[in-house]
Amino acid sequence: WASQVSENRPVCKAIIQGKQFEGLVDTEADVSIIALNQWPKNWPKQKAVTGLVGIGTASEVYQSTEILHCLGPDNQESTVQPMITSIPLNLWGQDLLQQWGAEITMPAPLYSPTSQKIMTKMGYIPGKGLGKNEDGIKVPVEAKINQKREGIGYPF
């Protein structure tokens, strides 16, 4: 799973105890939180001993009474004992993100700064495809070495 930073927030799916949930990747959250309206009624929960900080004031805060089996977005095995409260969407916190091996990377630019300036002046928009409708390739074509020494430039 990968997500480019954009105006859209990074969400991914996880399967907890066989049920699929979609949640926001939240590197600031220590624990994962499931929205109360998505928590299955037959799954046990208890009033949380500690409150939640950073999501405003939540009057009802619960925690799963059990440690639950979870599959991450790329089927990474993990366990979670999530908090449950009235929030608009689920949050995947560091308790799961660490088990999934999540990392934030900033790849090196594919092109030199000079070539990026030239392309921008020509109308290229980063992240969009090349071409009139911006639907062309988004990454450079990878050169392949001709090991057989056949074809253009080599005698037959």
Swiss-Prot record:
Residues in G-patch domain copies: 111-156
Pfam families assigned: G-patch, RVP
Annotated protein name in UniProt: Endogenous retrovirus group K member 104 Pro protein
GO biological process, one term: viral translational frameshifting
Catalytic reaction list: Processing at the authentic HIV-1 PR recognition site and release of the mature p17 matrix and the p24 capsid protein, as a result of the cleavage of the -SQNY-|-PIVQ- cleavage site
Task of the protein: Retroviral proteases have roles in the processing of the primary translation products and the maturation of the viral particle. Endogenous Pro proteins may have kept, lost or modified their original function during evolution.
PTM note: Autoproteolytically processed at the N-terminus. Expected C-terminal autoprocessing not detected. The sequence shown is that of the processed Pro protein.
Keyword Protease: yes
Organism taxonomic ancestry: Eukaryota, Metazoa, Chordata, Craniata, Vertebrata
InterPro entries named in the record: G_patch_dom (IPR000467), HERV-K_Pro_peptidase_A2 (IPR051592), Peptidase_A2_cat (IPR001995), Peptidase_aspartic_dom_sf (IPR021109), Retropepsin-like_cat_dom (IPR034170), Retropepsins (IPR018061)
Origin: domain of life: Eukaryota
Family: Belongs to the peptidase A2 family. HERV class-II K(HML-2) subfamily.
Keywords carried by this UniProt record: Aspartyl protease, ERV, Hydrolase, Protease, Transposable element
Enzyme class: hydrolase
Description of how the protein assembles with itself and partners: Active as a homodimer.
PANTHER family in the cross-refs: GAG RETROVIRAL POLYPROTEIN, RT1 CLASS I, LOCUS CE15
Active site per the UniProt annotation: D26
Organism: Homo sapiens (Human)
The EC number(s) this enzyme carries: 3.4.23.50
Entries under SUPFAM superfamilies matching the protein: Acid proteases
Domain Peptidase A2 stretches: 21-96
GO molecular-function terms, A-Z: aspartic-type endopeptidase activity; nucleic acid binding
